[in-house]
Amino acid sequence: MKVSVIIPVYNGKSYIKQSINSALNQTFKDVEVIVIDDFSNDGTYEYVLNEFGNVGKVKIFRNEKNMERSYSRNFGFNVSSGEYIFFLDYDDEWKANYIEETIENFNNFDIVYSIPRTFIDKNGNVLRVSKRKYSKDINELVFSAQIAYPSATAFKREKFIYFNENYNQREDWELFIRAVLSGLKINVIDNNKVMIREHDKRTSGGLSFLNNTLKVYFDYKNKIPKNYLPFFLFHVSETLLRYGKLKDGWLLLLKAIKLNPRILLNSRRIGSILKRGFRVRI
C-alpha cells in the first residue's frame, strides 16, 4: 500500500461520510483509509460500519474507551501499512488531487504541509478563501503556529513522529515544533487543496485551547532557537490576550517586541494586538 489516510473521529456522524469519501475519491488510488472511532456515543461507529464496512479500502477500529485524538492518530499509524502517512480530521475534506500533488512534492522532504485556504460550513458551502500571506521561512511558520492542521499534514512513514498524548489540544502545533527541533525537513506548499470545516462542535477553542497553549509554552520556551523565540512568544501572548489574560498577555508581548521590534512590521500582528490587546473592533 502506497498511502495510508488516518481519520480519528469522536461523535462525528454528521461529517465523517464526506471526509472518508474525499479520501476514497482521490485521483491517486493506492490508498487505505483507517478510521478510529474514539468511543463515540452518537452512533458514529455503527454508522461508519454500515456505510463503509464492505469497502475493502476502509479499515474501521474503535477504542475501548475515550482516549482522545492523539492516541487515535498514533494507533492509526501503528495499524497502517502505507509508505506515506496522511491525516484527515473527520470534519475536513480534500480536493480530489490533494494526495497526488502532495506525493509529487515530497522529494527529499520528510513532511509535506499544504496550506489550507478554503473554509467550508456544516453543509460544505465555501465560507471564505483565505488570501493571507505567509512567510517563506518554515521555522517562523512553525514556531508562530501558522502551520499545524493535521488534515494538511503528510509524513514519509520512516520519518513519522508520534503525537504527544499528554496534549488534548495544540498537539498538532507541539508535533511540528518537535519536528523542527529534531531536524526533520518540511516542505510547505500553497496549493489550496485542503478544506477546513467550521461548525459549532469544532474543538479549536475553549479554555482547553488556552491551557494547552500554555503547556507548549512551558515545555518549549527554553528550547526555541533565539532568533525564532519572538515569534513563539508573540503567538502565546495573543492567545492569552484572546482569552482575557491581559496582564500576562501584555508582558509576554512586550518581551517578544523587545527581542525583535521588527515583529511589528506585519499588518496581521498589528491587527491582532488592536483586536485582542485593546479590544478594538477591526
Task: Explain the meaning of each model-derived region.
Residues 97-127:
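Conserved donor NDP-sugar-binding/catalytic core segment of glycosyltransferases
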Residues 12-25:
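Short, well-formed alpha-helical segments that are part of the catalytic scaffolds
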